[in-house]
Curated annotation (Swiss-Prot):
Co-factor(s): Zn(2+)
Keywords tagged on the record: ATP-binding, Cytoplasm, Fatty acid biosynthesis, Fatty acid metabolism, Lipid biosynthesis, Lipid metabolism, Metal-binding, Nucleotide-binding, Transferase, Zinc, Zinc-finger
SUPFAM superfamilies in UniProt: ClpP/crotonase
Gene field: accD
Pathway: Lipid metabolism; malonyl-CoA biosynthesis; malonyl-CoA from acetyl-CoA: step 1/1
Cofactor binding note of this UniProt entry: Binds 1 zinc ion per subunit.
Cellular compartments per GO CC: acetyl-CoA carboxylase complex
Database matches in Pfam families: Carboxyl_trans (PF01039), Zn_ribbon_ACC (PF17848)
Name of the protein: Acetyl-coenzyme A carboxylase carboxyl transferase subunit beta
Native source species: Clostridium novyi (strain NT)
Amino acid sequence: MFKINPIFKKTKYITINTSKDNNINKENIPNIPEGMWVKCDRCGKTLYKKDLDENLKVCKFCNKHYRMNAWERIDLIVDTGTFREFGENITSKNPLDFSGYEDKLKGIKEKTKLKEGVITGKGKIYGKNVVIAVMDSRFMMGSMGSAVGEKITRAVEKATEERLPIIIFTTSGGARMQESMFSLMQMAKTSAAIARHNEAGLLYIPVLTDPTTGGVIASFAMLGDIILSEPGTLIGFAGRRVIEQTIKQKLPDDFQSAEFLLEHGFLDKIVNRNELKKVLYKILELH
């Protein structure tokens, strides 16, 4: 077959004029503030940040529940003007003189305006008195150290003493490694307090939010009378890869999701954020 000499072939490219457009300058570029738009990491839709916040940080296209901080949750659940915080002066120390821990705590406190990774107090839900504890993932990923364990324990004990139900919103990466055994012993301490609350015939409702893992899920987070969760919450003890390497098996794609746990009987109900207050009130009323 006759072949064309390569020198006669057309080059496969086009010439682009790289000269600057004199009409383009900084005045022509729209000034869009940073953070005004958010791309949903589940469905890929672009969301107006203000609309996302007004929709309780839930994507209107795919129902992805983004994380809320502790005060946002309190404002969402507790009747306006009824919340009274207690235990606010309980803060973490550095019992093991862990290098850099004190500086890290100081920086996080300044950044988040929180004293610890959980806020505890009393309030009302549609007029029903309740003790509430809300963990905050912004504070060292909600890790449970001695101060977090102490605040939760005191909240449960106060609920027991005053014969009130307690609701705990969990979010945590697990035990706080900088406190080692002081952190791990909080698992037993919080669990014992909840056992005494249960023996008194009182109601405990944990609400699992993304993520709830490690020592928290292995202790008070799964000891509720009725266990609720938000959609899509990551729930588990060890990490996915650690488990797969240990058992030498491939895990399901939805493993450690709230939906997977509900299907296998570890949760009682998955509740959308905009329905959560009504569902909690209904449970309180039935009890």
